[in-house]
Structure formats: structure tokens, C-alpha cells
Amino acid sequence: MRPTARQFTLPDLFSICPLQDATNPWYKQAAAESRAWINSYNIFTDRKRAFFIQGSNELLCSHVYAYAGYEQFRTCCDFVNLLFVVDEISDDQNGQDARATGRIFVNAMRDAHWDDGSILAKITHEFRERFVRLAGPKTVRRFADLCESYTDCVAREAELRERNQVLGLNDFIALRRQNSAVLLCYSLVEYILGIDLDDEVYEDPTFAKAYWAACDFVCWANDVYSYDMEQAKGHTGNNVVTVLMKEKDLSLQEASDYIGRECEKQMRDYLEAKSQLLQSTDLPQEAVRYIEALGYWMVGNLVWSFESQRYFGAQHERVKATHVVHLRPSSVLEASCDSDSDSDC
């Protein structure tokens, strides 16, 4: 892996994305209610940071679930806030403790009567009650399975961090698909649309091509956008930028360029597979609606990444215009956490 430069140019992912962005009309009302719900538990030690990240995540929901009705959108906001609780609890835990936290989350998600008396179990039960009211049985089962895969992979990420180990690319892709929570968020699409797909639909080659392309596009875009924030915190091991630099002996700029080419291929695969599904009679129309809805995630995530200050802080408009990222030293990021700005910390 070559020495890291102090700046790099992001790939222009908007230029390869023909999908149209939109926002949810229920955003302000539902986001405020969801935020009040999670804050009523008083579990965040840094309220300013919690408020910003929650608001930022709810803004993301507005883009990626633009088509959701009020109740469904509110439930989606609740879920991203629940994930924030899980992350907040497990962020500084070792692998063993992170697995224990994950088990609480999964057990409460699978069983409405399971209770260890923890706040996490109570919050999870309250989300689950809203979710299962409208979700189909197959969707509920898959969602619980994905919750378990997510927490297992988050714990594995913690173990890799303890060992200062960076995975090879193929192993990393498999891990990143799960610990990013993108698949969990995609599972909410069935709930929103009021559909309950058979497991066989996910095994269809054309459906799977679109599904995994949409997942990888979001994961890889997030990694290149978040790299500066993560390197300033000293947490770069769970990022495809680092994986590419190490495995392929690339510079930071070369890794960014590589990601741009891969994202272009992922977008092309998604669009081609979606077009084939539209012309096919092999799968139910609900499967096509599901794949089309994933497009909101692909474009909405791009728009949100520069609309919010999550990754680039107060420089987000400049970075959007120039694509140039100046790497921040850790002291600068720490100072921004203590300032009055809305920079992510």
C-alpha cells in the first residue's frame, strides 16, 4: 500500500446515475416524532452528536424512501434511529461484547416476549410492534435473519479492528454487504410497498443481479465518501478504499478512480437487469416494483451525501462542486466535534 496523499478527487458518481431523486412529503413530521421517541430513553451521552446524526439519517430516509406513506416512513425513521442505538452501544466494544449487544437486538427482534430488561430490548420491541403490523410473514422472517447477519458481521468487524486486520477484497465485499446495514434497509422496501416476496424471487439470477448491484453501489459510494471522516478517526480498516490500496498496491487517488469504474459497472448491471425484469414474465410484478424502488436508494444516497454534513462537514458544498477532498488530521475532526457546527463527529 502506497503512502497516503493529503488530498484526492472523488469519482463523479452523479454522471453515471440517470435515476431521479425525490423526497418524502412526510419527512419533517415523521422525523420529529421518531427523534422524540428515541430521545425519550435518554441513552445518548453526547446529545448534540446524537441530534445531528439522527437528523441526518432521517434526511437520508426522506430521499431513499420517498414513496413511503406516513406510517411506513415513520417506521423507517424509527429503524435507522434504532440502528443508531445499536451502533452507539457497540461502537467502543470489543468483538465479544459487540456480539452480546447484537444478541439482545436479534432476540428482541425475533421474539416479542423475549426480554432481558435492557433499554435496547424495549426499543427493539417497540419498533418490531410497528413493523410486524403491516409486514408480511416472509418479510418479517427475512428481516430478522438479516438483523442476525448484520450483528454477526458488526462483531466480526470489531474483532478485525482489535487485530488491526484488513481483509482481502472478496472477503471484504461479503462482510461489507452485511455490516453496512444496506440489506436491512432494502428489506424495509417490501414493508413499504405492502408486498411479501417468495424466497425463490431472491434466487432468480436477473433479480439477484440487480439486487447485489444496487447493494454494492451504495456500499462502495459510502466508503469513498466517508474515507476522510474515517481516516481522521483512525478507523479505515472497514473501508473498500483501504482494502484496494493494500490488496492492489494502489495510491489513494488510484483507489478512488477504481471505485468510480466499479460503481459505473454496478449501475450498468442494475439498469440492465431492471430492464430485463420489466420485459420478463418469469417473476411477479411485485418483484419489479421492489427492484425499481432500490433505485431511490442508489440516487438518494448520493444526493444526501452532499446535502448533509455527514461526511464532509462544513465543506460539503465545496466538495460537491470540486470533488476534491482535503484529508483532515484527527485534531481537526476532534475540534469540530466540540464546536457549534453540525459536522459529523
UniProtKB/Swiss-Prot annotation:
Cofactor-binding details, from the entry: Binds 3 Mg(2+) ions per subunit.
Catalyzed reaction equations: (2E,6E)-farnesyl diphosphate + H2O = cubebol + diphosphate; (2E,6E)-farnesyl diphosphate = beta-copaene + diphosphate; (2E,6E)-farnesyl diphosphate = beta-cubebene + diphosphate; (2E,6E)-farnesyl diphosphate = (+)-sativene + diphosphate
GO molecular function, one term: terpene synthase activity
Binding-site positions, Mg(2+) 1: D87, D91
Renumbered ranges of motif DDXXD motif: 87-91
A GO BP annotation: isoprenoid biosynthetic process
Required co-factors: Mg(2+)
Keywords: Lyase, Magnesium, Metal-binding
Residue positions binding Mg(2+) 3: N222, S226, E230
Residues that, per the record, bind Mg(2+) 2: D87, D91
Pfam families (alphabetical): Terpene_syn_C_2 (PF19086)
The protein's Enzyme Commission number: 4.2.3.91, 4.2.3.129, 4.2.3.127, 4.2.3.128
Domain notes: The Asp-Asp-Xaa-Xaa-Asp/Glu (DDXXD/E) motif is important for the catalytic activity, presumably through binding to Mg(2+).
Role of this protein: Sesquiterpene synthase that catalyzes the cyclization of farnesyl diphosphate (FPP) into multiple products, including germacrene D, beta-copaene, beta-cubebene, (+)-sativene and cubebol, a natural sesquiterpene alcohol used in the food industry for its cooling and refreshing taste. Terpenoid hydrocarbons resulting from cyclization of farnesyl diphosphate are intermediates in the biosynthesis of biologically active compounds such as antibiotics, toxins and pheromones.
Family: Belongs to the terpene synthase family.
Designated name of the protein: Linoleate 10R-lipoxygenase COP4
Organism: Coprinopsis cinerea (strain Okayama-7 / 130 / ATCC MYA-4618 / FGSC 9003) (Inky cap fungus)
